[in-house]
Amino acid sequence: MKTAICLENLSYSAFSKEVISEINSYVTNSIDEVCLVTFDETMPFANVNAAVFAPNELDSFHNGIIISHKINHAMSTLGCSNNSKKVLYLYDLDWMIEPMMYSDVYDVLTDRNLNLIVRSEDHVYPIKNLCNREPDAIVKNFSLEKIWNSL
């Protein structure tokens, strides 16, 4: 399935490692298009067996799935004028760590054009408490197939 995954950058983090490992193992035996979109350009900490694009390319990413993992990336994807399905895979509850505008977080989490997937059952209560929305799915480890099947 045609998929773009948004990352902050390609430097080392637990989530980047998980995503790059998943992509590299998936594209080895698949003809599906999978690419990365990075919001900050950095040197990758590992080989990436997929195309890497800048965020401005998302407007021309049609008929696919765009997966973001941060609230601010989800805001960017929701603003794209394409017909791709938008997914927020909440790896961490970043709005509780980084200072963010409550209205921005609320608007993203309550947007019905965004499929909401969380990594842990521990994320369900804060989301429900903040915006009275249940996640569409819980996917414990980042897996393209599990995310696709949950949509």
Residue ranges and their predicted role:
Residues 20-21, 103, 121, 125:
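Residue-level marker for well-ordered alpha-helical positions
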Residues 33-39, 89-90, 116-119:
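Short internal beta-strands
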Residues 43-110:
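Extended catalytic core of nucleotide-activated donor transferases of GT-like folds
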